[in-house]
Amino acid sequence: MSKAHECINWIKEYFKDNPDGKAIIGISGGKDSTIAAALCVEALGADRVIGVMMPQGHQTDIGDSKEVCDMLGITSLTINIGHTCTVLMDWIAGSLTFAPHNKEYMPDAVTTVISNPMIKTNLPARIRMTTLYAVAALYPNSRVVNTCNRSEDYVGYSTKFGDAAGDFSPLGKLTVREVLEIGDELGLPEHLVHKAPSDGMCGKTDEDNLGFTYEQLDDYILGTGAVDAEVVEKIERLHKATRHKYKPMPTFSPNDFCALPSQVYIDFDK
């Protein structure tokens, strides 16, 4: 059985006890959301998949997102998060300017906030995930789709509590190479499946930002080819620096007070 059919069956199994539930998925127009949405449609039917487009102001490739929704025949919503991001950043800047007992005075707090790369990248991603869960609340028993893949996860190329969140992850254990193979197997348009992935904000591709290609990353993860030592060093450094994104939250337990924080996690099975 192909990986595509295995994944479709897995989604069916996930929803087995939730026969009326819908899959709520953010549609960016990139390969991951396109392929994850197509898998959900194959598993559940188009009437049980809701695509949510969330541009931040003007999105140059919004046409790709609309094409995905039209092609799959799914209900689509467009919610522009641009104003929300701007207002929230303004309020954060204002709080820094006038906060009592703030020992780090910021004379130009607005510039400090809007130019901070962590805020510029991660705030929109978290607002998008908040939006998806708000939409999910409108549809009883719906579940939010995580669209991250194994390659991105390995080097932490996602936002904690942003696109790294969700209720179920069809692509989380598949490398970019395997995701592309599924997209081709499903017969999805090549310009969507093989579109160069980017964050849609800085004008650079993911590979430009990472400093190596997904082919190199997948070769390293799967052990399928020689990878330059400098690239290996970059991959390992990113993996170690971002492991906190995927570890369970360290949680104090009175019975385990001698354990190190990194050894104490919530165990929901107990």
Whereabouts are the PLM-identified features?
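Conserved G/P- and acidic residue-centered "switch" motifs that form tight phosphate/ATP-binding loops
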Residues: 30
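ATP/NTP-dependent adenylation/nucleotidyl-transfer catalytic domains that generate, transfer
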Residues: 3-25, 39-42, 47-50, 57, ...
